[in-house]
């Protein structure tokens, strides 16, 4: 059947981007557009629940915000999940964020989802699903201990 990880992102403990993984494959990622009218500091928690059926190691995660590398820290690593965290500062009205395990252009164009988050109007939308089935949960009600950002 093929490998399928689960990949979610929690933003500020308030917004959850769910099912960002590909339908099949060892890659996970997404493209975000965040609209904000003033400076904001957002805390991101990246949660990978690996499918160990065909892999021995989970791929790392790379994050870029407006073409600048964002420092990503691994905060937990168990058999059931791997958690990374990062802080992204929004200085511009529009911030483009790329999150990925593999940066092939083809993955962003046809496979990874594209999501728009308007922090001004609080309208959050999946613009393109591509080869995934993402959805947005807001407000977030954490149903696993490691989803809480306290």
From Swiss-Prot:
The keyword Transmembrane does not apply. Belongs to the orthopoxvirus OPG027 family. Keywords: Early protein, Host-virus interaction, Inhibition of host innate immune response by virus, Viral immunoevasion. It comes from Camelpox virus (strain CMS). GO terms for biological process: symbiont-mediated suppression of host innate immune response; viral process. InterPro entries: Poxvirus_C7/F8A (IPR004967). It holds the Pfam family Pox_C7_F8A. The keyword Methyltransferase does not apply. It comes from the Viruses. The gene is OPG027. Inhibits antiviral activity induced by type I interferons. Does not block signal transduction of IFN, but is important to counteract the host antiviral state induced by a pre-treatment with IFN. Induction: Expressed in the early phase of the viral replicative cycle. This is Interferon antagonist OPG027.
């Amino acid at each position: 059947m093929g490998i399928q990880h689960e990949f979610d992102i929690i933003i500020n403990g308030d917004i959850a981007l769910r099912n960002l993984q590909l339908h099949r494959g060892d890659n996970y990622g997404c493209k975000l557009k965040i609209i904000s009218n003033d400076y904001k500091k957002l805390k991101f928690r990246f949660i990978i629940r690996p499918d160990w059926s065909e892999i021995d190691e989970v791929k790392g995660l790379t994050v870029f915000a407006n073409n600048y590398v964002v420092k990503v820290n691994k905060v937990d690593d168990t058999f059931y999940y791997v958690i990374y965290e990062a802080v992204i500062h929004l200085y511009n009205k529009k911030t483009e964020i790329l999150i990925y395990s593999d940066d092939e252009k083809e993955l962003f164009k046809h496979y990874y989802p594209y999501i728009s988050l308007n922090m001004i109007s609080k309208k959050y939308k999946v613009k393109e699903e591509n080869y995934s089935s993402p959805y947005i949960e807001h407000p977030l009600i954490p149903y696993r201990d490691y989803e809480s950002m306290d």
